[in-house]
Amino acid sequence: MKFKLKRIDWYIIKQFLGTYIFAIALIIAISVVFDINEKIDKFLSPDVPLKAIVFDYYMNFIQYFANLFSPLFTFIAVIFFTSKLADNSEVIAMLASGMSFRRLMLPYAISAGIIALSTFVLNAYIIPPANATRIDFQNKYIKNKKVDYVRSAQLEIEPGVIAYFDRYDARSGMGYRFSLEHFENKKMISRLTANSIKYDSLYNWTLIDYMIRDFDGMREHITEGSRMDTTLTIVPSDFLISVNDCETMTSSELSTYIDRQKKRGIGNIQTFQIEYHKRFAAIMAAFILTSIGASLSSRKIKGGMGLNIGIGLALSFSYILFTTVTSTFAINGNLSPAMAAWIPNILYTFIAIYLYRKAPR
């Protein structure tokens, strides 16, 4: 059976998306004003070009925060315009004309689908390169959060080949107390050590004051030297990991990076895994929060629109808070990144089902 969209459907879709865009514009405008006020001292520096502030920072700042709080804007939009419809008795008129609440939800679902698809495309492909530009600006002119120093970095660069840096400084491109161990059938067959190692270019390194020990049964062959150029399938970015790095990768890059780091035995990748799963969880969040908002605000109540908006804001902020809490547990506890991303959606799905059943018929 085909559903033909009626004038009322287009009216609801227009109201939904219009209110959503208005909410984004309003909140982002306020956020930009507060951000300028906070960073005005940095921006007034003669070293910071106005063009970079506008195009490298704020153009990308707006995209990032608009998409980050998309669930909140979706919820506010639904609550606001549905409460207005209910307050004007328009919802009652629709239901009295024979339209079921389920049918009434169709334009809401279409609008949520448009927002969900837009959010996914932005998250997966458009915002990551924009974030790279924004974060580069922040690191250069505001506060450098880029990781350029690491201690005790160990990773498996190939099956049975373990590399270890006691410390590495990206500013000089130098690593210290480096070792490279080769294993076959769980037995060490060679061990290379160097007082220092310098990164040259992609996979090209220079060993300084090195020693190679090759094991052949009970025999040991030692080779020493002051300098040697070699090729290692690692680059500094493999172990110089910043929390912000996950925001600069497209979803395909994120998936490839996670798989590569897992194979190399690097453990601190929970933030990257959470970011990857969140991008898919955000698709469902648009539908869940739309259902909650429509079900909650479609009934005309004594408190009017203000009460509905208050309840809606409380629920939306609790959703964001719950998402933050589960992410923290995944990073610092035993909760899996996939569960951390999806638990808020699962919980709020039950809330959506309950409110849907209680909605006016």
Outline where the language-model segments fall.
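Structural signature for solvent-exposed beta-strand/loop edge elements and short helix-capping sites
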Residues: 157-210
